Structures are given as structure tokens and as C-alpha cells.
């Protein structure tokens, strides 16, 4: 089964107990902490519950005609996360989105009509 890297992008202070439990079930406790987890419905359900707090790491290569989106599974911890125009990034090509629709909206705003996803399929926007 494939894997995905999940990062806690915002702190838990002031959040409802439901959101805190969803984040803790992902194994995240502190802001900036990352975990590599199995890609399964249980994990995605918890990501959806706390979508405003966590993000899945994607590496986007804009060098070709259409951007190539890969899931970033690097083991090296990345402590630098900045919020550029509402999008969380490390400034080195890794972007954090909690929903695929957010990723597609980001690419659409950059002027792209399609992209190649991590499965090698071309996806129309």
C-alpha cells in the first residue's frame, strides 16, 4: 500500500476536542511534526476532520509543459513551513494540501489546465 507524509501545520490551542482527537490519532502532537502513514480511508478520514490543521506533502515540478505532482516521502524532517498567499510550502517545491481539490485549485490559479499525478495519470482541471 502507498504512503503519505502528514504534517501538523497549525497548533491545537483553542481547537475543539473532535479536531484534537483526529490529529492525535494521526500521531501528531506538536506544530511542525511530520509522520509517514499508510494511505488508507482511516487516515484520510482523520485528515478530513482536521483539514484546517494538517496537510499532506506534495512535491510539484513545474519544469515541463504540465506540472508533475508527486507525494513527498522524504525522511529528513523539514522544519521550515511558510504560508505564501494561503498555501503552505517549504519554499523548495514541497507544498502541503489537506484536500486534492485545494491542490487542483492551486494549479488552476497558476494557469494550468491539467497535471500529471503521483500515479502517472494526466488529470484535467
From Swiss-Prot:
This is Large ribosomal subunit protein uL30. CDD domains: Ribosomal_L30. Residues 1-61 are annotated as: Large ribosomal subunit protein uL30. Part of the 50S ribosomal subunit. Residues 62-125 are annotated as: Unknown. The keyword Ribonucleoprotein applies. Gene3D superfamilies: Ribosomal protein L30, ferredoxin-like fold domain (3.30.1390.20). One of its GO terms (molecular function) is structural constituent of ribosome. NCBIfam families: rpmD_bact. Belongs to the universal ribosomal protein uL30 family. One of its GO terms (biological process) is translation. Keywords: Ribonucleoprotein, Ribosomal protein. InterPro entries: Ribo_uL30_ferredoxin-like_sf, Ribosomal_uL30_bac-type, Ribosomal_uL30_CS, Ribosomal_uL30_ferredoxin-like. GO terms for cellular component: cytosolic large ribosomal subunit.
Amino acid at each position: 500500500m502507498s504512503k503519505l507524509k502528514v504534517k501538523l501545520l497549525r497548533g491545537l490551542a483553542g481547537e475543539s476536542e473532535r479536531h484534537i482527537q483526529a490529529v492525535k490519532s494521526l500521531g501528531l502532537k506538536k506544530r511542525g511534526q511530520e509522520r509517514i502513514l499508510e494511505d488508507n480511508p482511516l487516515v484520510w478520514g482523520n485528515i478530513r476532520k482536521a483539514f484546517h490543521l494538517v496537510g499532506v506533502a506534495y512535491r510539484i515540478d513545474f519544469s515541463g509543459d504540465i506540472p508533475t505532482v508527486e507525494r513527498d516521502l522524504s525522511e529528513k524532517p523539514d522544519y521550515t513551513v511558510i504560508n505564501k498567499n494561503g498555501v503552505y510550502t517549504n519554499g523548495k517545491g514541497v507544498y502541503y494540501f489537506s484536500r486534492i481539490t485545494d491542490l487542483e485549485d492551486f494549479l488552476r490559479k497558476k494557469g494550468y489546465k491539467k497535471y500529471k499525478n503521483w500515479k502517472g495519470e494526466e488529470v484535467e482541471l
